[in-house]
Amino acid sequence: MAGMRLILVGPPGAGKGTQAPNIQKKYGIAHLATGDMLRSQVARQTELGKEAKKIMDQGGLVSDDIVTGMIKDEILNNPECKNGFILDGFPRTVVQAEKLTALLDELKLDLNTVLELQVDDELLVRRITGRLVHPGSGRSYHLEFNPPKVPMKDDVTGEPLIQRSDDNADALRKRLVTYHEQTTPVVEFYKKKGKWAAVDAAQKPEQVWEQIVAILEKAE
């Protein structure tokens, strides 16, 4: 089982946040999300973290080399990575994919697969714009898929529910256009390498999970 290394790709609302912990638990591997890695390096004041903080403080985007450096640091020093890892949020461009390939070659590691969670854009819009949250507890509901017993009221306290402002349809559609523009070339890059697998993420989470396990069993 040693060595399950995969990349998880999917648009906002596709369920990466649900499935990544499942994969992490089943295979005993590390979940490397770029945002978390950045925050951790900045908090620990590592050389990479200091460099990244300087750029972010100026409102810039952290370079691909810094992110690749952080991934290398995790692979070499994070004990959870000894069985493998899930990369989440990277690579987002073909240049990043090439840098990651070079890094894995340097470390003599293979990538098992790239899992793409696929969902129709309009279903994503319905999923995300229907989300309701109870601010006090963080309990979440959905207008269509998991409605509260009383409209717009929390089941437990009866307090009002809110919709998050960044969950509005226009903003989300823009994010999805950007996502597809960025991701399509990356997916093509891995398809050519024979490292890509599609998952129908429009299904219920349990069914998505079954499909993921079936793909990973083959990819071992």
UniProtKB/Swiss-Prot annotation:
Keywords: ATP-binding, Cytoplasm, Kinase, Mitochondrion, Nucleotide-binding, Nucleus, Transferase. It is an enzyme of class 2 (transferase). InterPro entries: Adenyl_kin_sub (IPR006259), Adenylat/UMP-CMP_kin (IPR000850), Adenylat_kinase_CS (IPR033690), Adenylate_kinase_lid-dom (IPR007862), AK2 (IPR028587), P-loop_NTPase (IPR027417). PROSITE patterns: ADENYLATE_KINASE. It catalyses: AMP + ATP = 2 ADP. GO terms for molecular function: adenylate kinase activity; ATP binding. ATP binds at G13, A14, G15, K16, G17, T18, R131, S140, Y141, Q203. Its main location: cytoplasm. Gene3D superfamilies: P-loop containing nucleotide triphosphate hydrolases. Residues 33-62 are annotated as: NMP. Catalyzes the reversible transfer of the terminal phosphate group between ATP and AMP. Plays an important role in cellular energy homeostasis and in adenine nucleotide metabolism. Adenylate kinase activity is critical for regulation of the phosphate utilization and the AMP de novo biosynthesis pathways. This is Adenylate kinase. The gene is adk1.
